[in-house]
Amino acid sequence: MIKNCQIFICALFTFASLHAQSFEIATFNIQNFGQSKMAKTEVVDTLAMIVRQFDIVAVQEISDISNQTAGAFLKVVNASGARYKLNCSERTGVQPDDRKSAEQYAYYYDSRTVTLTDAALYNDVNDDFQREPYIASFTRKSDSLTFVVCTIHTAPKQAVEEIAALAKVAKWIPTRFRNAKRIIFCGDFNASCSYASPAALNALAIRKAPYYWVVPDDADTNLANSACAYDRFVVTDNLRSYVGGWDVYRAFKSKKVSDHWPVYIKLEGRR
């Protein structure tokens, strides 16, 4: 009996250890996320519930010029006792021709499972992006795995060109961030349907080694009638062995919440 209990406890400990290293990162374009949406209690409660399902959520399309929405939303996320923290970018659109499309990015992350160590907007000296990508470095607490997340919301009509320019961002990241060997690109790439064909994407350097596109071209990440793989995850090859899967989190059917669903990857221990 004692031996059986020891086996059970050992198995339980092994399962707990494996589970502790299973970790989920989401990307979520919360369409036109500003004070008007924050005033809709049911919508905000749905959004907060979604964030609490993941260890890190990269949010795009925060459109509030007063910069109040991201912080106000964090209070709702944590109202039930969660311990999320927020890191929010400055408004993007540094170049004069991009200012009419300026938005903020945000990372909401569970402080019990992950630490954010640094963050910065990409230094877009060549004006490759309408909204400069936002980059943050993280350390997973369960095993001290370090990685960098770069999130972007491309301009739809320039999607292919902006996705191509992520290769430049990949070269810039190690000049700005320490321990930047493992990189995760995520966000609303607009990488599908009329904005970016598979053939156009296949011609890009970011589509080839050392990069691995986790979310396939035939995915459906939006609430429109047409199935389009707008929202993507791309990881460097040295993270590929950690990726335990991906999915679309279809937690709502109303476009009042967003016109995109969250997309997420599971980042496990090295397999």
Where are these regions (language model features)?
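Positively charged n-region of N-terminal signal peptides that target proteins for export
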Residues: M1-Q6
